From Swiss-Prot:
Carbamoyl phosphate binds at R54, T55, R104, H132, Q135, L267, P268. Heterododecamer (2C3:3R2) of six catalytic PyrB chains organized as two trimers (C3), and six regulatory PyrI chains organized as three dimers (R2). Pfam families: OTCace, OTCace_N. The gene is pyrB. This is Aspartate carbamoyltransferase catalytic subunit. It comes from Clostridium botulinum (strain Hall / ATCC 3502 / NCTC 13319 / Type A). Transmembrane segments: none annotated. Pathway: Pyrimidine metabolism; UMP biosynthesis via de novo pathway; (S)-dihydroorotate from bicarbonate: step 2/3. It catalyses: carbamoyl phosphate + L-aspartate = N-carbamoyl-L-aspartate + phosphate + H(+). Catalyzes the condensation of carbamoyl phosphate and aspartate to form carbamoyl aspartate and inorganic phosphate, the committed step in the de novo pyrimidine nucleotide biosynthesis pathway. Belongs to the aspartate/ornithine carbamoyltransferase superfamily. ATCase family. InterPro entries: Asp/Orn_carbamoyltranf_P-bd, Asp/Orn_carbamoylTrfase, Asp/Orn_carbamoylTrfase_sf, Asp_carbamoyltransf, Asp_carbamoyltransf_Asp/Orn-bd. GO terms for cellular component: cytoplasm. HAMAP family: Asp_carb_tr.
Length: 307
């Protein structure tokens, strides 16, 4: 039973609970008209302390398509945060008006702090370079829907693996399924963090390798998860400029890939995936964005206990 729970980390739900959410998402995709009023009278608060397009719109569209309503902010300067209000006080106040909250914050752990003080379910919509569990649910539903399984996969993660919270969450989640292995492709400065390598992979004897050339791994990958180098995570503009074009996926590199490989990307894209890949059936990132709305619909319905 997920009613009243928080989602702060992809490990918060068991595999059985994740499957509950995915099966409900399947039902919503199949017959969306059946869910048009399940959240009548319910309100979602979107508390976005960082810019967002897909995640915020996806949450808002999800709640509206369930018949609920949305309040919130997408720019903290337009709220009492600008006056110095704490996360704890913000969530306490929002809990007086809303039934569930989605929070994005630049500081790692901020949604967890909010959950400690909240009387309503809190969903982590991304905290700094830490975790992004609803993007992970999106990624898992996309893979499950298009591949048919979440096990026995070779997953390549490419780009900014140090600051890329979507990668951290995805590796944690996919490490729970059988016989998955990982290939990490990044500049030396943007390698996967030690805590992922040691606490998730090595501790659980999960096979992985780190390489520098994308072409060296393309032929073995079932999934290629691309990420952008995130300008907003750099303190030094010169470092960003030097690293931003490190890995670019184009048609030439795709020649090495399996015919049924999937290219995923949490978006936004800058230049790390050439536009020619949009016409390749293996480019699944816009399908992935749509699955994000459906999985958030299912998650909201489950946490509110309306399904």
């Amino acid at each position: 039973m997920l009613k009243g729970r928080n989602l702060l980390d992809p490990m918060d739900f068991s595999l059985e609970e994740l499957e509950e959410v995915f099966k409900l998402a399947d039902e919503i995709i199949e017959e969306p008209e059946k869910f048009l009023h399940v959240c009548d009278g319910k309100i979602l608060a979107t508390l976005f302390y960082e810019p967002s397009t897909r995640t915020r719109f996806s949450f808002e569209a999800a709640m509206l398509r369930l018949g609920g309503q949305v309040i919130g902010f997408s720019e903290p300067n337009s709220s009492s945060v600008a006056k110095g209000e704490s996360v704890a006080d913000t969530i306490r106040t929002v809990g007086c008006y809303a039934d569930i909250a989605a929070m994005r914050h630049p500081k790692e752990g901020a949604p967890a702090i909010a959950a400690m003080y909240s009387d309503i379910p809190v969903i982590n919509a991304g905290d700094g370079s830490h975790q992004h569990p609803t993007q992970t649910l999106t990624d898992l539903l996309t893979i499950r829907s298009l591949k048919g399984d979440l096990s026995n996969l070779t997953i390549g993660c490419c780009g900014d693996l140090k600051f890329g919270r979507t990668v951290h969450s995805l590796v944690k989640a996919l490490s729970r399924y059988k016989n998955n292995k990982f290939v990490f492709m990044s500049p030396e400065e943007l390698k996967i963090p030690d805590y992922i390598r040691k606490e998730i992979l090595e501790k659980n004897n999960i096979e992985y390798k780190e390489i520098s050339k994308m072409e060296d791994a393309m032929a073995e990958l079932d999934i290629l998860y691309m990420t952008r180098v995130q300008r907003e995570r750099f303190f030094n503009e010169d470092d960003y400029v030097r690293l931003k074009d490190s890995y670019i996926l184009d048609g030439e590199k795709m020649k090495y890939a399996k015919k049924d490989m999937m290219v995923l990307h949490p978006l936004p894209r800058v230049n790390e995936i050439a536009y020619e890949i949009d016409q390749d059936p293996r480019g699944c990132y816009f399908k992935q964005a749509k699955y994000g709305m459906y999985v958030r619909m299912a998650l909201i319905a489950k946490l509110l206990g309306v399904r």
